[in-house]
Amino acid sequence: MGSMEQQQPESAAPATEASPEIIFRSKLQDIAITNTLPLHRYCFERLPEVAARPCLIDGATGGVLTYADVDRLSRRLAAALRRAPLGLRRGGVVMSLLRNSPEFVLSFFAASRVGAAVTTANPMSTPHEIESQLAAAGATVVITESMAADKLPSHSHGALTVVLIDERRDGCLHFWDDLMSEDEASPLAGDEDDEKVFDPDDVVALPYSSGTTGLPKGVMLTHRSLSTSVAQQVDGENPNIGLHAGDVILCALPMFHIYSLNTIMMCGLRVGAAIVVMRRFDLAAMMDLVERHRVTIAPLVPPIVVAVAKSEAAAARDLSSVRMVLSGAAPMGKDIEDAFMAKLPGAVLGQGYGMTEAGPVLSMCLAFAKEPFKVKSGACGTVVRNAELKIIDPDTGKSLGRNLPGEICIRGQQIMKGYLNNPEATKNTIDAEGWLHTGDIGYVDDDDEIFIVDRLKEIIKYRGFQVAPAELEALLITHPSIADAAVVGKQIEPEIGEIPVAFVAKTEGSELSEDDVKQFVAKEVIYYKKIREVFFVDKIPKAPSGKILRKELRKQLQHLQQEA
């Protein structure tokens, strides 16, 4: 994985008054950010103050690991990862194929100590999806659980070491029994080892994202980029998100998703808060945990906000401990905000906006600040501090002023280093001046608040998950009765987003049905990528270059909906 050494484009100097570009910055003052530490040391920098405090609370068992426990166990695991048979070194890659669990957190920071990167994957993914990511990321170690282990490619077991966190199984190592022995002879990785394995621009997290177009790609997030992103949110005298060590943060969102990994796990650890870890989301169980542990901070996504807003049971629960509800991954309308706040009148509800490639947070609601600002319903915050944001005309590239919608671009040390082994996609996303082009259309109003209004990019967003049309199209055309295919998103409720819809051109004489197409895809992809509707057409509209004309398909879809 030597290409992870490719350099992030250098940031241009901050714009001056004479610059023709219109650049927006945070209302909060920039701060000094220590982003040259290894990520694990940065997140645990307050360890001497919080060592005895709860760090991870297992929502299923009630078990508690203190900050001292998490530090000790992650050091022990790091030492085990370095030893045979794993032999992990700087530049290596570990796949974390886990639901939320204490083991997820320990694995992530152990890999950071070794100088390796963690590529996070959804354990509900199909075998094909997992195998593709394993191969693309170059992972040599997989830390997983029995429910996902059977999905791993059997032919790669010689080159792949599998570690299970739950049951013992032939051919696999056991997380606790084989790697985490507590006998005195078992070494702990020390801070002095960091100097041997660390550079702030080394990759530490390798989530997969489809970006603005195409197939999933490895997003190279470095120690520097992630520590910068965390600092932008929770560091300084007046942090953008006013968290503190007395907070109890709910982790109901999957840690394999960058929102949870960064804003819940890393930010929570940075401030010394307790994190209540939910293995699997369930609305009743979530409300139980809020009551039992007096949760104060609840990072959610719009579908969960909607579920709480519509839940009759929520009114009978004591959710009064919650003081802050962060919503991200998809836009949310005012009617849902109002219905939700009726259930939690004592909480502040606000939205943020992110993109995996941006580290991921671009903007955050300033009502969460230690010294809060008034904010508007429907806004997704203002740009984070120590960063620059501009709105450009998608056709001309010219920067636009306030209240003019255009493509959102972000620049700062929090953005990705690039896409793994894909310089062309990197070049198409981060320009020569260091601006990351998001593919989202939005505007900045007179109060510096950002509103998302449309999507320039092809990616479909369903319940906060990314669905890449190109991935589904590549699968569809492998069917012997499909001559050509294209996939677009069909907007349903704003809080849910879009569903994948396929336009299919059948081979001559084919009797292929809509159910045939749906079932063919469903066997190969995770649930949120399933095709929900199929329309048969004579041919797929394409430009002379062969590029699918998705605007034409969206017009056809709109016409079909009107006819229905």
Swiss-Prot record:
Residues holding ATP: 209-213, 217, 351-352, 356, 440, 455, 547
Gene3D superfamilies on file: 3.30.300.30, N-terminal domain of ligase-like (3.40.50.12780)
GO BP terms: phenylpropanoid metabolic process
Binding of CoA, residues: 280, 463-464
Gene Ontology MF, one: trans-feruloyl-CoA synthase activity
Binding locations of (E)-4-coumaroyl-AMP: 259, 263, 329, 351-352, 356, 364, 457, 461
Protein name: 4-coumarate--CoA ligase 1
Source organism of this protein record: Oryza sativa subsp. japonica (Rice)
